From Swiss-Prot:
Domain named Ras-associating: residues: 25-119
Gene3D superfamilies recorded: Phosphatidylinositol 3-kinase Catalytic Subunit, Chain A, domain 1
The name this protein goes by in its record: Ras association domain-containing protein 9
Compartments, record wording: Endosome
Comp. bias regions, Basic and acidic residues: 375-386
Membrane spanning residue stretches: none
UniProt record, GO biological process: signal transduction
Gene behind the chain: Rassf9
Organism annotation: Mus musculus
Entries under SUPFAM superfamilies matching the protein: Ubiquitin-like
């Protein structure tokens, strides 16, 4: 223990203001005593841990008097060094000020706590191993203990008896003090654990606050960069792109159908299909060569591997374009086959209509021939009727009426019934007048 410096130590309650921190030049430290922060000032480079414990116990005894609860000697206590969840008991002769300065920037995260030695560690690490007493079973005498006591002088017997009674009294006192010490150790252990739990809860709250601050900062950055609805847009953009892609494909199909309606649509479509097929074959060959070359070059060095990765990415993009073009070509081919089937169907319909037209023409010609034969028979009958006339000449009126009848019957589609009846009555009247 240092010969001086202990009497200069003073303790006081720390100010609860969170903004005030310890000044290392003031040569003072903060020690937790039963959930209270106490400042120990007047430290020197020779001040040890046991000096600080003695000063704290004296201040506690002066403050509480008979109601004090820190009982025992300074050697029964120790100062525990706590840092970020780890703990270490300081030996009694630790230079406390040197240790405090050694922490440097980590001083705000380090704390000193006064605890009972037995509550923290039953066997402190700084104690050396004590010599074990091995009882010698071999007795140097052959007599019994009672007979041996009788052989001793009276004064020595009295000393042995007094010593025995003193030992018994000490054993009784140690038993009562041991029970009391056990209770004190239990109380200090509970207090220390409660203090540790409070520290852990406080640390968890601080971490939660830091996490919330980081999340808020990230949210503000995303809002500043992508807008307030960046989450909504992030989930809807893929769907919108899919819809736009579908609309583009539909527009291409419609454009292709419109092109097919033109006279040169079929030829252009065939040229496009041939071009795409040639392009696919060419790109497939290039892809195979590039893949083989990239595999061989990638084994040689890292730069070649990076170049191969870039080429592979380009090849993948080209493959995607080829797949898209192939799908479009297949769609166009399917539409082309459908249009070809429609054209064949239209040709078959035209052929059927042509055959029907030929049949109708034949029927029309046959009807026209039959009508001509009927007209000639009627002319012959008229001539035979006019032959018995006296002068053998046809009157002009009769000839004019016969010409009218001939013109009326020379129709390929026939005459209406009313018109034919009127013509027959007129002819009969004319014949009667002529006779």
């Amino acid at each position: 223990m240092a010969p001086f410096g202990r009497n200069l130590l003073k303790t006081r309650h720390k100010n609860r203001s969170p903004t005030k921190d310890m000044d290392p030049e003031e040569k003072e430290i903060v020690v937790w005593v039963c959930q209270d922060e106490k400042i120990v000032c007047g430290l020197t480079k020779r001040t040890t841990s046991i000096d600080v414990i003695q000063a704290l116990l004296e201040e506690h005894e002066a403050t509480f008097g008979e109601k004090r609860f820190l009982l025992g000697k300074a050697s029964d206590y120790c100062i525990v060094e706590k840092w970020r969840g780890s703990e270490r008991a300081l030996p009694p002769l630790t230079r406390i000020l040197k240790l405090w300065k050694a922490w440097g920037d980590e001083q705000p995260n380090m704390q000193f706590v006064l605890v009972k030695t037995d509550a923290f560690l039953p066997v402190p690490l700084w104690r050396t191993a004590e010599t074990k007493l091995v009882q010698n079973n071999e007795k140097p005498w052959e007599l019994s203990p009672a007979n041996y006591m009788k052989t001793l002088p009276p004064d020595k017997q009295k000393r042995i008896v007094r010593k025995t009674f003193r030992k018994l009294a000490k054993i009784r006192q140690d038993t009562s003090s041991h029970d009391r010490d056990n209770m004190e150790c239990l109380v200090h252990l509970i207090i220390s654990q409660d203090h540790t739990i409070h520290q852990q809860v406080q640390r968890m709250k601080e971490l939660d606050m830091e996490i919330e601050k980081c999340e808020a900062k990230i949210h503000l950055d995303r809002v500043g960069n992508d807008g307030a609805n960046y989450v909504h847009e992030a989930y809807l953009m893929p769907r919108l792109s899919d819809e736009e892609q579908k609309l583009d494909i539909q527009a291409e199909i419609n454009q292709t159908l419109e092109d097919l309606n033109d006279s040169e649509g079929m030829a252009q479509l065939e040229e496009q299909l041939q071009y795409y097929r040639a392009l696919i074959d060419k790109l497939s060959a290039e892809i195979e060569r590039e893949v083989k070359g990239a595999g061989i070059d990638g084994i040689e060095d890292m730069e070649g591997a990076a170049a191969c990765e870039l080429e592979n990415s380009d090849l993948e993009s080209v493959k995607c374009d080829l797949e898209t073009s192939m799908k479009a070509g297949l769609t166009i081919h399917s539409h082309l086959s459908g249009i070809q089937r429609e054209i064949k169907y239209s040709d078959s319909l035209l052929q059927m209509k042509a055959r029907e037209y030929e049949l109708l023409a034949k029927e029309f010609s046959s009807l026209h021939i039959s009508n001509k034969d009927g007209c000639q028979g009627k002319e012959n009958r008229g001539k035979e009727a006019e032959a018995p006339s006296s002068n053998g000449e046809t009157p002009p009126l009769t000839q004019r009426v016969f010409n009218i009848y001939t013109n009326d019957t020379d129709s390929d589609t026939g005459i209406s019934s009313n018109h034919s009846q009127d013509s027959e009555t007129t002819l009969g009247d004319v014949l009667l007048l002529a006779t």
